[in-house]
């Protein structure tokens, strides 16, 4: 994929940035595509950079993701919680699986969705081959992760752990309005105007 270049005029001449670097100047991080260790490392590095620049200023994390590796997503989530700078989350397109989890983990009151975005939650997926004992070990670990994710999602949404566990048994799709009612987001945004929530 070709990344667009933005050229800016400064007092000292022209300066060119790739589009993501230019967005970073405005404290915007874009999480697009599947979440793996490489993507997580890039997002974490940007979060830490913006935290070092100004720990009191909001960071805006735009999410358009089908989800991905649980441990990679948890690394981003833990960094969001670790830094002092508030992280606002905005769903554009879709936030599914780990993408929806990260969306819900944004700063309370600053979790948004665009009008036609869709949000989907479900239980963690896993696959493992090998000896029966190793398969058993991995099955226990994925069940532990499932319980951990359900508890955190319940904490962020205000739903009971039992409801979250039941809803995540299968793919559970929501519109922006449904995600707001569920507690994953706080408001829906249209044309830079927040609707259906505080702000």
UniProtKB/Swiss-Prot annotation:
Keyword Isomerase assigned: no
GO CC, alphabetical: cytoplasm; endopeptidase Clp complex
Enzyme class: hydrolase
Alphabetical GO biological process terms: protein quality control for misfolded or incompletely synthesized proteins
Subcellular location, record wording: Cytoplasm
MF (Gene Ontology): ATP-dependent peptidase activity; ATPase binding; serine-type endopeptidase activity
Family: Belongs to the peptidase S14 family.
Database matches in PANTHER family: ATP-DEPENDENT CLP PROTEASE PROTEOLYTIC SUBUNIT (PTHR10381:SF70)
Name this polypeptide is given: ATP-dependent Clp protease proteolytic subunit
Species: Citrifermentans bemidjiense (strain ATCC BAA-1014 / DSM 16622 / JCM 12645 / Bem)
């Amino acid at each position: 994929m070709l990344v667009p270049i933005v050229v800016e005029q400064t007092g000292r001449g022209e300066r060119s940035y790739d589009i993501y670097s230019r967005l970073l100047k405005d404290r915007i991080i874009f999480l697009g595509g599947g979440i793996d260790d490489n993507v997580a490392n890039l997002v974490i590095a940007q979060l830490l950079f913006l935290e070092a620049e100004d720990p009191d200023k909001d960071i805006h994390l735009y999410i358009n993701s089908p989800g991905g590796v649980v441990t990679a997503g948890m690394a981003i989530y833990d960094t969001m919680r670790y830094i002092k700078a508030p992280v606002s989350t905005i769903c554009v397109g879709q936030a599914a699986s780990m993408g929806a989890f990260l969306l819900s983990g944004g700063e309370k009151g600053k979790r948004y969705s665009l009008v036609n975005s869709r949000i989907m939650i479900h239980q963690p997926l896993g696959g493992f081959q090998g000896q029966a004992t190793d398969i058993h070990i991995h099955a226990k670990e994925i069940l532990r992760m499932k319980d951990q994710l359900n508890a955190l999602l319940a904490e962020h949404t205000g739903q009971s752990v039992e409801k979250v566990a039941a809803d995540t048994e299968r793919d559970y799709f929501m519109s922006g309005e449904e995600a707001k009612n569920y507690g994953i987001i706080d408001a829906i945004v249209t044309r830079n105007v927040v609707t259906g929530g505080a702000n």
